[in-house]
Structure formats: structure tokens, C-alpha cells
């Protein structure tokens, strides 16, 4: 059994992590923690998330002393703000823990990106260089050796799973940048109350146009430029991405289908549609990314869906942990 703790367990993603880890046969969920300043400190986890009453009734302990918190702990999950993960991940790593960070603090190796897109100067570039990007279907061998796994963002996960097989097999004319229009449920904005996620204010609208921090993450790990526009939808959870691409001359739908099937034939959490395209309702509450596509001439439209809190966050973190420690990849997820 591996002893584990979750920091940031009061939020939506942290709650999903706690539920997965509680039912994982090889994990011993020792502690759920929040920042020392959190208004949720010392509350019972299941009082905040009543669906887990009688299942996970641990207290939310304030994180005041990382050295003590890390004692006897093998695995740490950080469901914390970017700046917080930036500061505390190296301390848990120094204590010998394996860290799965769900923030953006270690996803992009170019340190200059953090000042521009995240608003802080990165001070741990040595860990930027060592962090393994946890796109599970494409980084399994590297994840197996990692001490720090940077779990991808929600939009980058679905975008890359849709585009990587096409780019790796040189099927796209990348002089025409892929155009990614993706809509997320309001849970992507977090649990903290704000005008943005107020019931009466939620509509369907784009945000972060040309400035969203997931743009450089997608581009760095795809190795190509893209046009990415995120949207906020008036539903609780899930992401649907519609991606428009230009094909190289002569590329057929049959080739595209074969490329996808070869890429994901042994990847149980990616489901491919042979007919039609996926709908959001088929992935909400599940750890899958569903992918379908339509071709007309040299134009390709790929549609990908995922639950932003699961395959876009908590489920992928647990998937990476399973890979890292040699467990069944879908352990506790299905």
C-alpha cells in the first residue's frame, strides 16, 4: 500500500481525487489538506461534499508544516493554485515524495511563459526540466520514471489527444494552423463563488481570446502553432472541442481512421467513434476522452469530449499514478 495525501481537497477536482484514491486497492488515503488560510480548514470533507458522507469522512487539515505533512507519505497530489504548487511541490519532492501536480506550475518548460501567462516568475527551473508531462496515452514510458508529474490541463488534454495522431503521422498541412474551439462547463472555473460562475450570469461566451494559459501548453507539447479559443458554457461539467484542420493532398478518411486506431488501440480511456461524433453527455462522470471526425475534401473536423474534472484532471492524475507504480492503468477509474 502507498500512503497518499491530497492538498486542495476542498475543491471539485480535489474531491474527485479523494473519491478515486479512497477506492483504490493499492492506496492508503492518509490525509486531506487545504491551505492554512482556507475557510474550509478543519471542516469535514463530507460536509463540503455530502455525496461522500459515510465514504470519505476525513477532516480537511490545514497545511502548516510540509515536513510533518510529508512524513510517511509516498504520493502527493496537488490540486492547488499554480503559485501554490510552484512553491510547495519542491518541498514535498525534497522529502522523497512522488508528486502529481494538477496545476499549471510545471507543465511548460519555457520559464518565460509563466511571467506572461501565469503572472509569476518561475523560481524552480531545475524542476521544470525534470518534470514529466503527464499526457498518459503518450508519455507512459517517461511517467514510469518520474518523481514529478505535471498533469495536463483540461483543454490541452482533449486537444492533444485529438491532434497528436494526425501530427505524428504528418497528415495535416500545418501551414494552416489547427483551429480549436472548445467549450467547458462552469466547474472549470473552480468552486469558489464569483460573478463569473454565478447562476444568473452564466451564458455561452468565449474568454481568454489569444491570452489563455493553455495556448502555450498546447503548442509546446504538440510542436505546432494553433488557434485556441475557450468558451464557458451554461452547464456544470464537461468539455467539447471542435477542431478544424487542413489535410495534406490525398489524405483520406480511411487513413485518418487507421491512424487513430493504431494510436489508441491499447489505450482504454480513449474511445473512438467509427460513425458520427461524440456528445458531452456520454463522458460526464466518466474518465474517458471520446473522439470522432468528419472529412470533406481536404478539410477535417475532429470532435473530442471529456469530463473536465476527470479525464481533464483527477482521472488522468490517477491514471498517471497507476502507470508510475505499475498498477492496472484503469485501476479505481472504471
UniProtKB/Swiss-Prot annotation:
Highest taxon above the source species: Bacteria
GO (cellular component) term, any one: cytoplasm
Enzyme class: oxidoreductase
EC number: 1.2.1.38
S-S bonds: none
One annotated GO biological process: L-arginine biosynthetic process
PROSITE patterns reported for this sequence: ARGC
Localisation per UniProt entry: Cytoplasm
Pathway linked to the protein: Amino-acid biosynthesis; L-arginine biosynthesis; N(2)-acetyl-L-ornithine from L-glutamate: step 3/4
Catalytically driven reaction(s): N-acetyl-L-glutamate 5-semialdehyde + phosphate + NADP(+) = N-acetyl-L-glutamyl 5-phosphate + NADPH + H(+)
Keywords, sorted A to Z: Amino-acid biosynthesis, Arginine biosynthesis, Cytoplasm, NADP, Oxidoreductase
Pfam families from the UniProt entry: Semialdhyde_dh, Semialdhyde_dhC_1
A single MF term (Gene Ontology): NAD binding
Residues at the active site: 154
Free-text function comment from the UniProt entry: Catalyzes the NADPH-dependent reduction of N-acetyl-5-glutamyl phosphate to yield N-acetyl-L-glutamate 5-semialdehyde.
Family assignment from sequence similarity: Belongs to the NAGSA dehydrogenase family. Type 1 subfamily.
Protein name: N-acetyl-gamma-glutamyl-phosphate reductase
Gene name of the encoded protein: argC
